[in-house]
Each structure stands twice: as C-alpha cells, then as structure tokens.
C-alpha cells in the first residue's frame, strides 16, 4: 500500500480591485476585464511565475447572463495573457461563489491533482443586463424581461408554491423579526461598519490587497482608481432618517444593507511543493470549508450551520477564532448570526475593518475580499485562526477556517 501523505493548501497572495459603487468608476469596465486585472496583478507581484505553471483558474460569478457569460474564468485568463494551455472554470454558489472557488482550489490541491491555482471571483452588477425569455409558441406576447442585477428571475412556479419567493431584503426583515433585532441595533452596526472602514483606509490596511485600475479618460487622459468608493460619511442621525425598503413598519433600509457594486478578487493557492519550487511565501493555510442549507426565506442565517460544521471539522471553537469575517449582506443578517454564537455586536475581532455595508458586495468577488482581509489582518495582529463566512441566496451558507503561517 502506498503511504498516504497529507497535502496542505496555502494562500500565498490575495488581491482585489477597489470596489466600485453602482454606476461608478468601474461601470465602463467589463467583468472579464476586471477579473483579468486581478490575475495579471498576481503574476506581476510574482515575476518568477510563468503562466504555464498555473494548473487552473477558478472564479466565482453569480450572474453569468451578460458579459460574464460562457465561462468568465477562461475568458479572463486569456485576456490576462496567460498561456492558452491554462484551463479555467467558473462556478456559481451565488454570494458564496468567490469563497467556494478558493475552497475548490484547496480541495484540488489537497487531492494531489494540482499544485498551483488562481482562485477568486468577479461581479459587475452595474453592467448586469436585462434578459428576455424566448416565446413558447409563435407570436406569443407574454415573454418576461428580467433585470439580472440581483435576486430572482424566471421563477419556477413550483418553487414559488413550495417555498415562496422572498427578495433578499425580505429575508433580512424575516430575520430581524425572528431575532428581535431593532432598527436602532441595525443602524448602529451599519455605522460601525462605515467607521471601521474609514479608519482602515486611513491606516492603509487595504493597500496590500488592492490592485489599482487604470481607467480611460477623455482624449489621452487616464485615471487611476485605487480606493473603494462605496464607503460614505454618515451618522446615526442620518441613518435613522432613511425609509424602510420592505414594508412601512420594517427595519431594513439602504443604509443598513450592503451595496450593489462592481469588483474582482483573486488569490494564489499553492501546495508546499509549489511554494518551495517557485519561491512562494505562504501567508495562511486553508484548514476546512463547509457549506449548509437553510429555508430560503431566512437565507441570511445560512452561516450558522455552515460555521458549526466547519468548527466540528476543525475541532475548534468559535472562541478560538482571532479574526471573524461575516459578510454583511444586511446588518440584521450579520447580527442574527452573531446572536446565535453569543458574539457582541461590536466585538473588535469581527469585521474589524468594516464589511459589505461599507465596502460593498459585488457578489462573486466578495468571498475573495473577506478572505484577503482575514489573511492580512491575521498577520497584522499576529493571530492564529480566522473564520470567513457568508450567507447565500436561496438559503445556503459557507464557512472557511484558515490558519496564519
């Protein structure tokens, strides 16, 4: 019998574009070009790597109905100048796609099928198209036109009958009611996200992960876009004036929800063999990843069973985590997850540099962002373990635990 050797998967680098606001600085950049920029950014930072050394490129993308169609990972790697011999695949676990792409890369490396993979995700929500279904018969006039920016489209009547069809804000409102999370609690959490991001920007905490984007300007002028543009100056007083978006007496507002954004992320995942062979410095080891399902009407609680599975797999406790990144789809959603684990709303180790409420949530790219932040924050604090978790539309959760190297 062959001796079984445990292969580890390491994060050796993590980059992303700045996140653009809806119809903002990245509105003129296609999703495949955005993803290509992060792939190029990784290789630029590691000039010893020839593109042919990359065994695969795995990207997450939630839309895939516009310019990000037909396997955006393959398109992006070719646009980035990688060898045509490098394969690429695109996966879709909606909001968790980017984190799942990294998990898929780690599993592939741990299985011994690859040594070096680029993984991450991309989303251009600004450029998400309207789509129209085909007529089911000649001269039919009942074709639906759907906005693909976010949420449901072409809903299966059976799905609607069995589970109902709740918008993302409605699912957050459901959690706010179920967990008795007040509007004030949500607004305070949202303000905290903005303030923490502002402080992180002032301290230059994002400079290690951001790849500047050169934007075309008038004539020969160009502009360098190098700072997230979704964060905003606000106050608790200003947040309290915003109207609820689900129902008149509701608590979910634009101010305590994540943004609609554009961006891309990419991480360099390697085996120990690849690290030694290509002189790559491991930053963190990917320990475990877990996914779980919940009822679609409370999709935001998905991280809870996913985190519990990940903790059981790693034989760790939530108290062992030095850094926790909970993707802030909504303040109510993040607070519900924190309540389940008895974590204070203002815990300093949770979303310590802000989250999706302040930075934005370009769906496929967000997993790479929270993972990059966790990696660099672990090193800044000299911590050991970090947990990254996200809720996922239609009722899922994903969680990953990493260890600083």
Q: Locations of the language-model features?
A:
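Short, well-ordered amphipathic alpha-helical segments that serve as non-catalytic structural scaffolds
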Residues: 31-46, 72-76, 101-104, 168-175, ...
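Condensing-enzyme catalytic core mediating Claisen C-C bond formation in acyl metabolism
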Residues: 5-29, 150, 235-301, 305, ...
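Conserved catalytic cysteine-centered active-site region
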Residues: 61-116, 146-151, 162-167, 233-259, ...
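N-terminal extracellular/periplasmic Venus flytrap/periplasmic-binding protein-like
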Residues: 16, 28, 32-37, 48, ...
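Conserved beta-ketoacyl condensing-enzyme motif
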Residues: 28-96, 100-117, 121-140, 210-225, ...
């Amino acid at each position: 019998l062959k001796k079984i050797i445990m292969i580890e998967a390491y994060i050796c680098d993590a980059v992303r574009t700045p996140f653009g606001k809806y119809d903002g600085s990245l509105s003129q950049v296609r999703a495949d070009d955005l993803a290509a920029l992060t792939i190029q950014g990784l290789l630029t930072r590691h000039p010893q790597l020839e593109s042919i050394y990359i065994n695969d490129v795995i990207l997450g993308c939630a839309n895939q109905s516009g310019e990000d169609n037909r396997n955006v990972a393959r398109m992006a790697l070719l646009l980035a100048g990688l060898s045509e011999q490098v394969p690429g695949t695109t996966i879709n676990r909606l909001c968790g796609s980017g984190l799942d792409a990294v998990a898929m890369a780690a599993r592939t490396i741990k299985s011994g099928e690859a040594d070096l993979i680029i993984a991450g995700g991309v989303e251009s929500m600004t450029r998400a198209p309207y789509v129209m279904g085909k007529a089911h018969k000649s001269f039919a006039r009942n074709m639906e036109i759907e906005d693909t920016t976010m949420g449901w489209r072409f809903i299966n009547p059976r799905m609607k009958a069995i589970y109902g069809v709740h918008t993302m804000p409605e699912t957050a409102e459901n959690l706010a009611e179920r967990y008795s999370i007040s509007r004030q609690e949500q607004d305070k959490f949202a303000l905290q996200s903005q303030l923490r991001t502002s402080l992180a920007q002032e301290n230059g905490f994002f400079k290690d992960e951001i790849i500047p984007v050169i934007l075309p300007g008038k004539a020969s002028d160009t502009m360098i876009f190098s700072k997230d543009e979704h964060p905003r100056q606000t106050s608790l007083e200003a947040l309290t004036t915003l109207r609820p978006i689900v129902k008149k007496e509701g608590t979910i507002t634009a101010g305590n929800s994540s943004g609609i954004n554009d961006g891309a992320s990419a991480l360099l995942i390697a085996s120990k063999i690849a690290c030694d062979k290509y002189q790559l410095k491991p930053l963190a080891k990917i320990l475990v990843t877990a996914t779980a399902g919940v009822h679609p009407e409370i999709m935001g609680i998905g991280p809870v069973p996913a985190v519990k599975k990940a903790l059981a797999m790693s034989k760790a406790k939530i108290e062992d985590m030095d850094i926790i990144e909970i993707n802030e789809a909504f303040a109510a959603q993040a607070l519900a997850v924190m309540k389940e684990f008895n974590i204070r709303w203002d815990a300093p180790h949770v979303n310590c540099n802000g989250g999706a409420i302040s930075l934005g949530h370009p769906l496929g790219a967000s997993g790479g962002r929270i993972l990059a932040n966790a990696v660099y924050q672990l090193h800044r604090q000299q911590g050991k373990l970090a947990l990254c978790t996200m809720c996922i539309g239609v009722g899922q959760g994903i969680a990953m635990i990493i260890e600083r190297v």
